[in-house]
């Protein structure tokens, strides 16, 4: 369970309003697939993932990144109940997709990297700390249904 102060919640939601979520999602998922190439096995049906350029320009990667980040954004509306917010996605990734839950942590790290780049000086150490708590909480919630 993630424990955010009211100030951290306000910081996260305030900064989130400044980002282009679709671009963050596409960049974060693309980076995950490039930096951790073994994660590509879940996306082999996306076509050409043969190079960093191919991954980052792949329309299916961008579309799925958008889908992922919109789920993440929905979770930001439920910071006090992330397990509930991500329950069905946890079940899907566990029972049907068989995704290693460690990958959720890796994707969270990619989200933080992209946010740091996009937000620049607004992504203060306090903001990084708050977002780190959030992505850790989301990763934990997504891993919740694993046996």
From Swiss-Prot:
Gene3D superfamilies: Globins (1.10.490.10). Keywords: Acetylation, Heme, Iron, Metal-binding, Oxygen transport, Phosphoprotein, S-nitrosylation, Transport. CDD domains: Hb-beta-like. Red blood cells. The modification S-nitrosocysteine is found at residue 94. InterPro entries: Globin, Globin-like_sf, Globin/Proto, Hemoglobin_b, Hemoglobin_oxygen_transport. The modification N-acetylvaline is found at residue 2. Belongs to the globin family. This is Hemoglobin subunit beta. The lineage of its organism: Eukaryota, Metazoa, Chordata, Craniata, Vertebrata.
């Amino acid at each position: 369970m993630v424990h955010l102060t009211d100030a951290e919640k306000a910081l996260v939601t305030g900064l989130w309003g400044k980002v282009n979520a679709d671009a963050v999602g596409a960049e974060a998922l693309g980076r995950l697939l490039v930096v951790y190439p073994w994660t590509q096995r879940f996306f082999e049906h996306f076509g050409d993932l043969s190079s960093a350029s191919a991954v980052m320009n792949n329309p299916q990667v961008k579309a799925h990144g958008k889908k992922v980040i919109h789920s993440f954004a929905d979770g930001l509306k439920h910071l006090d109940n992330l397990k509930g917010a991500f329950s069905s996605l946890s079940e899907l990734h566990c029972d049907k997709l068989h995704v290693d839950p460690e990958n959720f942590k890796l994707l969270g790290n990619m989200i933080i990297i992209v946010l740091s780049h996009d937000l620049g000086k607004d992504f203060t150490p306090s903001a990084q700390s708050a977002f780190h708590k959030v992505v850790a909480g989301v990763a934990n919630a997504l891993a919740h249904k694993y046996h």
